[in-house]
Amino acid sequence: MGKRRCVPPLEPKLAAGCCGVKKPKLSGSGTHSHGNQSTTVPGSSSGPLQNHQHVDNSSGRENVSDLTLGPGNSPITRMNTASGALSPLPRPNGTANSTKNLVVTAEMCCYCFDVLYCHLYGFPQPRLPRFTNDPYPLFVTWKTGRDKRLRGCIGTFSAMNLHSGLREYTLTSALKDSRFPPLTREELPKLFCSVSLLTNFEDASDYLDWEVGVHGIRIEFINEKGIKRTATYLPEVAKEQDWDQIQTIDSLLRKGGFKAPITSEFRKSIKLTRYRSEKVTISYAEYIASRQHCFQNGTLHAPPLYNHYS
């Protein structure tokens, strides 16, 4: 069993991007065969937001590449057609958290849309929201179109106050994910925004002390050059890719830049931290409907002081 931690360990601020993958062929794993499948793993030349471990000596910030969270561990949102309000549906059985005492809310996604809209149209930033300002590790993810293609995903494993953290990572994920061009105002109507709060950090007893579909994992290891590296997958990645634990670990090692053959003994040397997440997603259409309703009825926090509903 893992050793429970209430918050992530004290460390430099971590920024993580997320990326889509194809089903993997994990070469060099030694004792584990995965068939004739292929994977796309970011290279070390992709730029600082995609590097598996990049330290900016001037700021102490460490950037760790990551994958996006998937829907399986997330409360699903729906629009109440009578009131225009957003409400989370219950989580499916077996997911990481129940709907009881959830911190994440659809209003957090609305605030992210506020921030992005104001930036893209040159308006002053929106007033502070009314949801909790407690500190959490967090991710902001943007997807686009009917097939919800990834358009940007950046987050931090350091606990940040939600008001400033969501504001910062809204713009970072939308404009500075080096895998994509910056989002534009023309793309707004097709966007989906997800906010993920990371919780329940635990030191695992070994590299298999976690559950696929329940836990996200962050590993630390020493590469073939004697350099400590880190890499992480958010809670839904392994389940969405149909990986078992060893496939996930091996993929994560490759993602972290480990190029040598992966052996059972090397896997045992990994330090693994597991965690869970709360996630909510809304579309731009839901955001607009919710903002109109809230403005008309004086509930939640008012939309930015401009008319963007025409």
From Swiss-Prot:
InterPro entries in alphabetical order:
AMMECR1 (IPR023473), AMMECR1_dom_sf (IPR036071), AMMECR1_domain (IPR002733), AMMECR1_N (IPR027485)
**Residues the record lists as Phosphoserine modifications:** S74
Stretches the record annotates as Disordered: 26-92
The record, for SUPFAM superfamilies, names: AMMECR1-like
Extract the Pfam families matched here: AMMECR1
Organism annotation: Mus musculus
Please, which domain of life does this record's source organism belong to? Eukaryota
The record's listing under PROSITE patterns reads: AMMECR1 (PS51112)
Name the chain's protein.
AMMECR1-like protein
The gene name reads Ammecr1l
- Locate the compositionally biased regions of type Polar residues: 28-66, 74-84
Q: What keywords does the record list, in alphabetical order? A: Phosphoprotein
- The residues covered by the AMMECR1 domain are 97-291
Instruction: Please verify whether the record's keywords include Secreted.
Output: no
